């Protein structure tokens, strides 16, 4: 029962009140028209796997949300660090160990600005475990960013430090939980060890977690008559916007399907493009076709292309190979 389709069906009734009995009537009438389809039972094992893969997505979304929230506090304390271009940033990862140490160990920006460069270099080396190729340059960029940042009243620095440190602790704790869930997912899927899992795991870039996330939502491929049906179920389809001789180039993704499946397919596409030249070329081709929404558009279209491969392998019970496809015995 899709709430969106029922809500749209309700609009066909003119001048109807919004009450519980009338809601039940609309749902019953919707079912009478034969528009409700039941999902096939996939077994308790797939349901257990689905609980794990969906909980993993929940944790990932919590981490993303916490990072987005923490950026506001980072901007207040160290404004220039938050707005620097990717190539100009002193650290490749704003949420990494060295960045966390800089944001929490130094109470104010003046502590960085007026610190001897030698002490700052030693600090970067220690917190970065000697992994920086040019720690002196990193310290120089860090000091310049501190000089260029806005200054706050001194009473604000301590609360900001506490808030930022708390966010780092929350993120670290949730990342530990994600790793624990990953281990549980691998253990569960290896207990199933289905032919479908072998097919997906044979694709370069798709590991046990991504394969499990996809299979937990698909269940069995016989539920889908074509790769188009699978794409529609994942919500990786685009509506045509056309009138007369005009056809809009800006078409929005429907996103009306299974958002969990869509997430794991997009993540799989992002990983596969780093392992298979064919998908890498396709990604950058789509990336260069437009000037807006480049990354999201290219990734979504690459995921749609990956669906054709996944559907083909699962329906034919085959494993992936760069030169030939072999059948699973």
Regions found by a protein language model. Give the residues of each.
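A detector of single, family-specific signature residues
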Residues: 1-329
